[in-house]
């Protein structure tokens, strides 16, 4: 052992090898996982800084030092306490893959302490090579790619591991599951909680872990499911996804597509991070055709980005409108890349208008003025909304801008498998193409049975807004208790009342909102990073802002002395002053002033509802304290009484809904929902129409259009009034399996797909073949450059570098898609009814709706 280690340890624990709490090495079951966790007690141990320094710079450790990092396969659980200085979960990822130790005795905590004092070496099987240990990284930093030599970037999105996942599933199987559609997966595994119950740790992981390696044979039934340690499992991009990333890094304009479960959203989030690294954070426009799709990728609608309002009028008129807005003009001038999700719902005419605006503003005649384009979507889903019923729908790929600018059109083919229903997979694929046979029809009609009645309420999807409103109102009427009515305050400079009413319908916030305790609601505006358009929740109570201020203070500090509440209850002016101080500290004065005026105007519309006592369930968080101390119990009771007093003092004030929202990572968040404002502005940014309303809508039932992009555990779909191609497919593919799906009024004659979309998909390339063709073209270009006379050729080459030639490679898949999708055979290829089910079926992936996007789980 090196002298500096011996000296340090002798200084810390002289001649007392077993008194020190140096239980710092926890090694999990299998070496192939190579997972090493550190946790130390700060009591009686002063070398925390030493250990942290070595973790930050592991390359300076010698072989003897690294013996301490043994990967013994049967370590007893040490009695560890979390490092006080290590407050965040970190991980080290390595690419080492070691064979399981053979003929090696398990190493105990006691052996380590003996080794420290006796200077006895460990076996070489317990050693790591210094060169393969990487510096510690935060959870949100890079995670490993499929290739052991490459890194891929992870996002901050989390997704809970479904508890029904089979224990014997390997990491590779999980990697191909639809659950792995999130780049960062937050796993709380019941079988590993006891082993991981040592606080937050730094973990060494390889890219080949198996979940069977994390199993604990001991009974863990007494563990609290909410106290488990969260383990980050690196999720890898597939080879075809990496190929598309490389194409984007090379500056190419790309459209990629795929059916549900092929990882479109994961790839898009990764693509956005890559582009921001290239162009800068402010120079990448992240947009989508709809508000819900935009919030899923952290962007805004394409209309909002472009500054074109509703996009009505000719291109020149819209160009002049953008020119008058300095904010939107700068956007167009500065961006380097434009990302558009759900491109399928953007019509060709609007895309050409945007192209015209970009070329004129940037004074560049290349497509979109030289802006790099990344389009994503599935044209088999909902098409663009037709403004004129007499004019046929034109898809984005039919536009002039698309034909000139988007040269790489790619089909994602690798399916990330889940615990799926194979029969349901085939049924969805046939529905996607409008190719329903007798057997598929019989299977769908069997799904008309009611769903099991449990705590999860099925989301009801309807094709029209009227059906949605009727179903939501029916559910609301069945709830007990008082109805709270919130009327919107509408305004704006527009004098044409008919036009004004039509424009107001563009706001998701309803003109009149009826709520009760227990109502299921959806947020319809982005408020912050975790509370976004599409977040689902349940109304818990109604209270005024002053009562909520006290309630929030109490939930943040349940041990708060009751004297503080007594002061606020007896002196409402002091309570109001405390609220104003906190609000002014958290917001700029201009923002705070605007929000204050919005709230005041909304509060004046109150109709003077009677004040009902707060429900006892609101105070459940205080009742969780387990104690027999009479003083503590008396304080809890006193706090409840004071809260009721403060609430009763709010008579005549506007009471707002207290909503418990459920995030995609299954965590909950209590929020008092306050009014927000919406506006459609003119070119001078003055509101033509505006609305002040709570950003909520009833959400037992949703329209099929609003459901696109969501995954729902239980779905009830009524297809009686389906009127659009792709609408039925979107609705039914929200479900994960047949067990969670109820289908009413199924009619095969209403299940259709656009022939233009089928023809377009026959021209798509695979990602791998597109990248290979690109490499081949680059080689040809390089050879020509070697024989070219020089500057003259180089100038020509440079002028064409941003417009690569179309990729003419064929796609390849396990189902024989290569033979069908020959790009040069489009004119000769004819779809026949008898070949439709076999040939076109291979165009789509064979998975049901999984974790393609951020989950919105109904409570």
Swiss-Prot record:
Cofactors (names): Mg(2+); Mn(2+)
Residues that bind ATP: 258-265
GO molecular function per UniProt: 5'-3' DNA helicase activity; ATP binding; ATP hydrolysis activity; G-quadruplex DNA binding; telomerase inhibitor activity
Residue stretches of biased makeup (Basic and acidic residues): 844-859
Disulfide feature: none
Region of interest (Disordered), ranges: 142-183, 782-859
Residues bearing the modification Phosphoserine: 70, 72, 169, 584
Note accompanying the cofactor annotation: Mg(2+). To a lesser extent, can also use Mn(2+).
Segments of skewed composition (Low complexity): 800-809
Induction (UniProt): Cell cycle-regulated. The nuclear isoform is present in very low amounts in G1 phase cells, but increases as cells progress through S phase, with a peak in late S/G2. The mitochondrial isoform follows a similar, but less pronounced induction pattern. The nuclear isoform is prone to APC/C-dependent degradation in G1, whereas the mitochondrial isoform is not.
The keyword DNA damage is annotated on this UniProt entry: yes
Subunit and partners: Monomer in solution. DNA binding induces dimerization. Associates with mitochondrial and telomeric DNA. Binding to mtDNA is non-specific and the protein seems to coat the entire mtDNA molecule. Binds to the telomerase RNA TLC1. Interacts with the mitochondrial single-strand DNA-binding protein RIM1.
Stated role: DNA-dependent ATPase and 5'-3' DNA helicase required for the maintenance of both mitochondrial and nuclear genome stability. Efficiently unwinds G-quadruplex (G4) DNA structures and forked RNA-DNA hybrids. Appears to move along DNA in single nucleotide or base pair steps, powered by hydrolysis of 1 molecule of ATP. Processes at an unwinding rate of about 75 bp/s. Resolves G4 structures, preventing replication pausing and double-strand breaks (DSBs) at G4 motifs. Involved in the maintenance of telomeric DNA.
Descriptive protein name: ATP-dependent DNA helicase PIF1
Organism whose genome encodes this protein: Saccharomyces cerevisiae (strain YJM789)
The organism's taxonomic lineage, starting at the top: Eukaryota, Fungi, Dikarya, Ascomycota, Saccharomycotina
Recorded name of the encoding gene: PIF1
